[in-house]
Amino acid sequence: MDESHGLQEDRLIWMFTQMLRIREFEERVKRSFAEHPGLLRGHTHLADGAEASIVGSLTALRPGDQILTTYRCHGYPIVLGTDPRAMMAEIFGKRTGLCGGYGGSMHLTDVERGFLGTSGIVGQGIPQATGAAYAAQIAKRNQVILCFFGDGASKQGAFHESLNIASLWRLPIVYVLENNSYNVLTRVEQEDANAAAGEPLSVKARAYSMPGVTVDGGDPVAVYGEVSAAAARARAGNGPTLVESKIYRLSAHGNIIVPPEIPLHFPEHEAIEVFGAVEEYEAAKRGDPVPRFRARLIADGVLAAEQADAIAGDVRQEMAGAIDFGANSPFPEPADAVKFVYA
C-alpha cells in the first residue's frame, strides 16, 4: 500500500473487517425498519458511507482514550469492541440492551470501552467532550478525547465556545467534523459561509489558533494518518486539532416509524428527492468506501478476494445473530420505568 502510515497488513485487514461489521449492522437495522414495521421503535440514523471515517479515526486511539459522538452512533461502539447483540437489543428497546432498553438507537454508551455516550441534540456533545478533555488534563491521565460531530453542529454556539476554551487551555482533544454535505434537507453550502465561499470547514480552526485539516473520509488510512497525528499532538500537551472528514451518507437522514394514517414520506436520499442531484448520489455510491477499500487491499496484495469473501460471510453470520438476539430478548418490566429515578 502506497501510504499506509505505518499500519501493518493485519491491522489493515482488521480495519476492513470493522468497516464490514458497521455496514452489515446498519443494513440489518435498515431492513428491519422496512420489513417489520413496529419491530423497532423510535428514530434511527444510519452510518452507511461513514465507515472509513469511523474506523480510521478509532484506529488512532490508545487504550484509555475516550470518545463522544452524535446520534448517528452505531458504528463507533462496534469498533471499540461492544457486543453487537447488546447494541441491537438496545435498538429494539429490550432489557438485554446495552443500556437496558432505556437509550435506544440515539443514546448508546459503553464507558468501560471508552465510549462516553452520544447526544441527541445537535452539537451538544461537543462541550461534554471538551469537559472530558479538561478532566483528563487535570488528572494527568495522558488521555486523548475524540469528539465526533457533523457539519450542522459546526454552526452551533457550543462548537465555537468549546474550540475557544480547548485552544486556550491546550486541552487533549481532537474534534472530528464529519461533513456529509447535508444537514437533514439543507445542503452545507446553503447554511455555512465557509462552504458557500468554496472553503473547507476546517478553516474554522483558524479563529481559535489551532490546526485544521481536511481529509478524504472515504479513505480509512488517510483518516488514520490525520487523526493519529492530531492525537499525538494533543497527547504531547500541544492542544486540540480540528479534522474535517469529508464523507457522504448513503441513506436518508433518518428512519422513523409512524402510524400508517400519518401521511409522512421519507426520501431514499435528500440529494435525489429534494435537489434532484441524481448524478451526485450515484457518484457517491460508486465511491462507496467499503468496496473501495476492499479493492485497494486486494490490489496491494494485502488480502485475497477469497479472504475478503470469507470475512464478509463471518460478518453476516455475526450480525444475523445480533438481530435474532435483539428480536427475541424480553422487554423491560413495567417497574423498570422508575429504576433509575432518584427524585
Residue ranges of predicted features:
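Cofactor-binding active-site loop characterized by glycine-rich and histidine/acidic residues
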Residues: 24-31, 37-169, 190-202, 207-209
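C-terminal intrinsically disordered, low-complexity extensions immediately downstream
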Residues: 328-343
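Cofactor-/ligand-binding subdomain signature composed of acidic, glycine-rich
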Residues: 1-41, 48, 281, 292, ...
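Conserved phosphate/pyrophosphate-binding and hydrolysis machinery centered on Walker-type P-loop NTPases
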Residues: 47, 312, 331
